[in-house]
């Protein structure tokens, strides 16, 4: 009994519905690689995060003086001072200076921007617009500074202004504060210096672009993740309401941050986060395929299908996703990039091999195998497939386009010198004998196309030559036909002349004979008349 593996999101209501047949496609070198859920996103709102860069340390019984904190504070001030000055230059141009421009009533320091594109000027406008919220958040800096909580909400009345985060505070609370009275000051200082040094290294890496110009270089959420430390998932969940995991959103880079204010005295940084709106399209899957060469009609070929398709229910489209962000389980796009597929391509995806189109290939660097869920799918007619455990060569019959090698076939496989351990069984319970016509193979490579064009041009030249020869023959036949027509006409005229002559002769003969008869009768009458005259005289 044959078991088909078909992906189709919706229920097939009509018998003509088309779904992707994974098993059949795998047998011709078109292997499913990844399936992702399609979602759309747009930047719609903003949130603010207050990052407290200097942790609070509880006082100890022996009144330790931590020199590492003082040195860390000094180094951090040197790091953040250029950023703070740059933000102040952009957000607060000097009153006497006329070198600034207004966007909707907002004054921007053009000199601080330098050479800026439209997008960079827009970022500067956003930075200036955020100053109102930044000042409201900074007004509550004392409450933020006093707390030793790793994360908490900054509220003004009932309105949430921001989320305060102390990335290293969580480690201080859970490890350092519990050991303050059990270790010597030197050991605690060294341990704290290690944590602060590592965190400072991350900050230097994160904010290196912002040292030039924070308005022109927004920080990505990946860099912000280093800034937030272990509090990143909690911050993401607090700022973004979605069922998609924080790891997926962060890895896609959908959230970007921009430093809008730096409070050097308190070592606090206010970061504006652009929060996307994410909508997941139901019943929409984006399937990635990996094509390897196959043995078709005694030559190495590759199937002509897109590397990525979109399937909604029983309909398929090509989906390039050039402007989308991909994660392991999701694909985030700002708009639909679907492109129509021909009916033949859809039939091929459904497992109708007679509708598939292949292209012949040549060369030694073609993709000829792929690992699939612990098994290997390979074109063993174009590369050497040797099983080492047990030891025997793997032969691919002529009627098989590729070979699927699983644990029942081989345990250790060598492909052109590369060794692989097979750890799984194949889920394909059957293999069809493929029959593919020669008309299904076309050339798509530029070199092959030019070769085929040369053949076509040669055929056209031969055709032109034959046409000229045929025209010459036709012209000869035409001249001979004219001469023949003249001869025939002459013969006809001659025959007509002879017939007319014969008729004239016959008529003359008859007329002469009639005249003689009439003359004879006339003479006879004259003789009788003279005889009568003689009798009368007597």
Curated annotation (Swiss-Prot):
GO terms for cellular component: host cell plasma membrane; membrane; viral envelope; virion membrane. The chain crosses the membrane at residues 487-507. The keyword Transmembrane applies. It holds the Pfam family Fusion_gly. Residues 103-127 are annotated as: Fusion peptide. One of its GO terms (biological process) is symbiont entry into host cell. Residues 128-156, 452-477 form a coiled coil. Residues 1-19 form the signal peptide. It is found in: Virion membrane; Host cell membrane. Glycans are attached at residues 56, 73, 182, 352, 427, 433, 457. The inactive precursor F0 is glycosylated and proteolytically cleaved into F1 and F2 to be functionally active. The cleavage is mediated by cellular proteases including host FURIN during the transport and maturation of the polypeptide. The record marks 95 as: Determinant for fusogenicity and cleavage efficiency. Residues 508-538 are cytoplasmic. Keywords: Cleavage on pair of basic residues, Coiled coil, Disulfide bond, Fusion of virus membrane with host cell membrane, Fusion of virus membrane with host membrane, Glycoprotein, Host cell membrane, Host membrane, Membrane, Signal, Transmembrane, Transmembrane helix, Viral envelope protein, Viral penetration into host cytoplasm, Virion, Virus entry into host cell. The record marks 102-103 as: Cleavage. Class I viral fusion protein. Under the current model, the protein has at least 3 conformational states: pre-fusion native state, pre-hairpin intermediate state, and post-fusion hairpin state. During viral and plasma cell membrane fusion, the heptad repeat (HR) regions assume a trimer-of-hairpins structure, positioning the fusion peptide in close proximity to the C-terminal region of the ectodomain. The formation of this structure appears to drive apposition and subsequent fusion of viral and plasma cell membranes. This is Fusion glycoprotein F0. The gene is F.
């Amino acid at each position: 009994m044959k078991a088909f593996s078909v992906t189709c999101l919706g229920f097939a209501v009509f018998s003509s519905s088309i779904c992707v047949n994974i098993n059949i496609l795998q047998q011709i070198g078109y292997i499913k690689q990844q399936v992702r859920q399609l979602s759309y996103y747009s930047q719609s709102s903003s949130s603010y995060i207050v990052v407290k860069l200097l942790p609070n340390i509880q006082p100890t019984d022996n009144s330790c003086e931590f020199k590492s904190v003082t040195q860390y504070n000094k180094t951090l001030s040197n790091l953040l001072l250029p950023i703070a000055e740059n933000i102040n230059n952009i957000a607060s141009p000097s009153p006497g200076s006329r070198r600034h421009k207004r966007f909707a009533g907002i004054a921007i320091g053009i000199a601080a921007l330098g050479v800026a594109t439209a997008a960079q000027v827009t970022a500067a406008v956003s930075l200036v617009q955020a100053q109102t919220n930044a000042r409201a958040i900074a007004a509550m800096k004392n409450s933020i500074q006093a707390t030793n909580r790793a994360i908490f909400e900054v509220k003004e009345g009932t309105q949430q202004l921001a989320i305060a985060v102390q990335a290293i505070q969580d480690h201080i609370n859970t490890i350092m504060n519990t050991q303050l009275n059990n270790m010597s000051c030197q050991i605690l200082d060294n341990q704290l210096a290690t944590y602060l040094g590592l965190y400072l290294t991350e900050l230097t890496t994160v904010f290196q672009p912002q040292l030039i110009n924070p308005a022109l270089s927004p920080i990505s959420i990946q860099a912000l993740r280093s800034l937030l430390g272990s509090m990143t998932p909690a911050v993401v969940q607090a700022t973004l309401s979605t069922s998609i995991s924080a790891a997926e959103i962060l890895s896609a880079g959908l959230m970007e941050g921009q430093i809008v204010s730096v409070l050097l005295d308190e070592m606090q940084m206010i970061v504006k986060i652009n929060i996307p709106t994410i909508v997941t399209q139901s019943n929409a899957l984006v399937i990635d395929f990996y094509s390897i060469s196959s043995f078709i009609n005694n030559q190495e070929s590759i199937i002509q299908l897109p590397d990525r398709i979109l399937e909604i229910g029983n309909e398929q489209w090509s989906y390039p996703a050039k402007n989308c962000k991909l994660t392991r389980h999701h694909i985030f796009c700002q708009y639909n990039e679907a492109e129509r597929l021909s009916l033949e391509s859809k039939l091929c995806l459904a497992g109708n091999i007679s509708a598939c189109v292949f292209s012949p290939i040549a060369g030694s660097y073609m993709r000829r195998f792929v690992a699939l869920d612990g098994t290997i799918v390979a074109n063993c007619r174009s590369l050497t497939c040797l099983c080492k455990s047990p030891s025997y060569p793997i032969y691919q019959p002529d009627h098989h386009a590729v070979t699927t090698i699983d644990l029942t076939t081989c345990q250790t496989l060598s492909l052109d010198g590369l060794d692989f351990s097979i750890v799984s069984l194949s889920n394909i319970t059957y293999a069809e004998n493929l029959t593919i016509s020669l008309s299904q193979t076309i050339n798509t490579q530029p070199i092959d196309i030019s070769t085929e064009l040369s053949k076509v041009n040669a055929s056209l030249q031969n055709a032109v030559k034959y046409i000229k020869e045929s025209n010459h023959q036709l012209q000869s036949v035409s001249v001979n036909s004219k001469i023949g027509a003249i001869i025939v006409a002459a013969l006809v005229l001659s025959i007509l002349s002879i017939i007319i002559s014969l008729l004239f002769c016959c008529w003359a003969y008859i007329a002469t004979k009639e005249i003689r008869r009439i003359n004879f009768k006339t003479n006879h009458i004259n003789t009788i008349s003279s005889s009568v005259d003689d009798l009368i005289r007597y």
